[in-house]
A protein has these predicted regions:
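Bacterial N-terminal signal peptides
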Residues: 11-20
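Flexible, low-complexity segments enriched for small/polar residues
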Residues: 45-46, 51, 70-77, 204, ...
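Structural motif
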Residues: 59-67, 172, 187-194, 266, ...
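N-terminal accessory alpha/beta regions
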Residues: 80-227
Length: 620
């Protein structure tokens, strides 16, 4: 049986390597076979098991519709198992999208706090285990060195140790966000929203590789903005991102004062630059199909200049903390402009402190005139409205969403069709994200297989998506270690200590620490090295792709190191002699490690290898 399990692991690993590319079969029923076999009798000189001659015509094994649905779900989710593929095939793609749009939103912040509260509780409960190990270490030291007295701790000494132990727990920080994101991705059914939010997180970027990393709630609350607006309006998304305390810290318009020349203080220009360059209109004026406009001399036309950045920076002055951190009981004062980030409520948006806002008139972007004397929030909303209505937004954001969901090199016609939907959803509304996402997924260029073999089609699936799909579709169990400690006294002979390992199958906690995956393949949500994401949309790998003017963003993090490391991760995932697919940091607190359960797949393989291969091809 072990040899069969190893063979299954090898086949699964092989299918995961092949799954880097999105392949499918063209659905076509206009031919003999696939069930079009009325009046035809097929005979064969030899038949065995399921390989009956009549199956060559009667549609047995014809999975084109399910393979196409599997391809669709690989674009729209983090991974779908056979049951979901079959269900989605029955109801159809458009009905599936509608179903997804109407699902309740699974926000990360409540889950983040639930996780932290459980860790705090289990940390306190685990003190006895820590104390038993501590006393055993003292006993071992005294045994090895006769000059060291064996321990016999007093209750006062134990209480002091317990107080110190409780102080060692740090958080919540980025680790708890990683736990919450992983568990939500693995557990929740609102997969399209989860996938779109992940795409948006690579466009409207913040990163835990900053001060935000010390505050998990700042990451989860920001991600909730992306979840909330995934099917909303892009204008509302852009405004809420601009007011996010997390974004304010990351791109430094939090506590951004108006100019004070006598103190040589000028408004910070960071967010003003990036909200144009990366979050809305890009660097150059675009046609609706995403190609660059040219001036009379044939040069690209910039969308803004340095004066525009300076003027827009004045707009984003005066934003500060909305309230103080409710988890810090020692804070008894109200929030104020200039309050340290560490003392503020990271889950609330910034508010305007009018006395710190530049109230003079602003003129920018060849047409936006903001009059003097206005409230600061009015200035900001005018600027956001102007950016939102800029003709670049549709092709600039639409192309990147296509890249994140469908393909790296969408045709100009594809981009233009998405731009048209962004500009008008058919009901006179601009920026309708639900309509845009549906149009991207259902566009003929996304659904047809006719051009799959063309050199400019497809995309390199990033390592996070490849790994997530495998983690979601494979059957899983948990390995949990339970400890029982009794103290008769606090000496070498006073401890009764037992542990037991059990397997759990229900209510698994998919708490992936994320950092190990990031270290291996250079990617995990909200861990990009800069505001420019893990890769730029216009990245061109050196060689044939660059020579053919093709883009391959994901190739930026695909090198000899990450490629080998990803194979190593697959090996750990699939090798049956490893204890876990991933480790959380808290197994010592009684939290389970996640393992794959190959028993059912092994039984299928033993009974019918052909069916097993069929399952693996549909899944991955």
């Amino acid at each position: 049986m072990k040899a069969q399990t190893n063979k299954i692991a090898f086949l699964i690993a092989l299918s995961m390597i092949v799954s880097t590319l999105n392949l499918s079969a063209q659905i076509n029923t206009d031919y003999i076979g696939a069930g079009n076999n009325a009046g035809i009798t097929i005979t064969s000189s030899s038949e065995y098991g399921n390989t009956k001659a009549e199956n060559t015509m009667n549609a047995t094994g014809m999975d084109a519709d399910r393979i196409e649905m599997s391809r669709f779900l690989s674009q729209a989710t983090f991974g779908a198992d056979m049951a979901e593929i079959q269900r989605a095939t029955r109801i159809g793609m458009e009905a599936w999208i509608e179903e997804q749009v109407n699902m309740p939103i699974n926000y990360l912040t409540p889950l983040h706090w639930d996780i932290w509260n459980e860790i705090e509780t289990r940390w306190a409960m685990s003190f006895d285990v820590w104390l038993a190990n501590y006393i055993n270490e003292l006993c071992l030291a005294s045994h090895e060195d006769p000059t060291i007295d064996p321990p016999n701790l007093t209750q006062a000494e134990v209480d002091e140790l317990q107080n110190a132990y409780m102080q060692e727990l740090f958080g919540p920080f980025a680790l708890q966000f990683n736990f919450a994101w992983s568990h939500s991705m693995m557990s929740n059914d609102d997969q399209l929203r989860q996938r779109v939010a992940y795409a948006l997180s690579q466009i409207l970027v913040i990163s835990a590789q900053s001060d935000l990393g010390d505050n998990g709630e700042s990451l989860s609350s920001y991600y909730d903005i992306l979840l909330h607006h995934s099917f909303g309006n892009f204008r509302d998304l852009l405004l809420e991102v601009s007011l996010s305390t997390s974004m304010g810290i990351y791109l430094s318009h939090f506590n951004n004062p108006k100019a004070i020349p006598s103190e040589n203080i000028q408004p910070d220009e960071n967010y003003a630059r990036e909200v144009m360059q990366l979050f809305s209109i890009g660097l150059f004026e675009l046609n609706p199909d995403g190609t660059r406009k040219k001036d009379a001399d044939g040069f690209d036309i910039p969308t803004y200049n340095n004066d525009d950045v300076k003027e827009l920076a004045r707009v984003f002055t005066g934003l500060g903390p909305g309230s103080t951190d409710p988890t810090m009981s020692h804070i008894t004062w109200d929030a104020f402009f200039g309050l340290s980030y560490y003392s503020v409520n990271k889950t609330e948006p910034m508010i305007m402190y009018q006395e710190w806002h530049d109230v003079e008139s602003k003129s920018l972007l060849n047409g936006l005139e903001i009059p003097a004397g206005q409230d600061g929030m009015t200035d900001i909303e005018m600027a956001i409205d102007y950016l939102f209505n800029h003709p670049n937004v549709g092709p600039f954001i639409g192309r990147q969403l296509i890249q994140r969901l469908i393909k790296s090199n969408p045709s100009p016609a594809y981009i233009e069709r998405i731009t048209e939907v962004f500009n008008d959803n058919g009901r006179g509304e601009r920026g309708d994200m639900e309509a845009v996402i549906k149009a991207i997924l259902m566009d003929p260029e996304a659904r047809t297989c006719e051009e799959l073999q063309e050199f400019d089609n497809g995309r390199l699936r990033e390592p996070l998506l490849r790994g997530a799909e495998y983690l979601r579709v494979m059957p899983k169990i948990g390995e949990q270690i339970l400890f029982d400690v009794t103290f008769n006294n606090y000496s070498c002979n006073g401890i009764e200590y037992t542990s037991d390992t059990i397997i759990v199958t229900d209510n698994l906690r998919f708490w992936n620490d994320g950092f190990n995956f990031f270290d291996a393949v250079k990617q995990f949500p909200l861990l990009s090295p800069s505001v420019f994401n893990f890769y730029l949309p216009n990245h061109q790998p050196v060689g044939e792709m660059a020579e053919n003017n093709l883009f391959g963003p994901e190739f930026k993090i695909h090198d000899s190191s990450s490629a080998v490391n990803y194979i190593n991760i697959l090996y750990i995932f699939t090798a049956p002699f490893y204890d876990a697919a991933w480790y959380n940091w808290y197994q010592g607190l009684g939290l389970e490690n996640i393992m794959f359960d190959y028993d059912d797949l092994t039984a299928i393989y033993v009974d019918d290898p052909e069916k097993f291969l069929h399952l693996s091809l549909i899944h991955i």
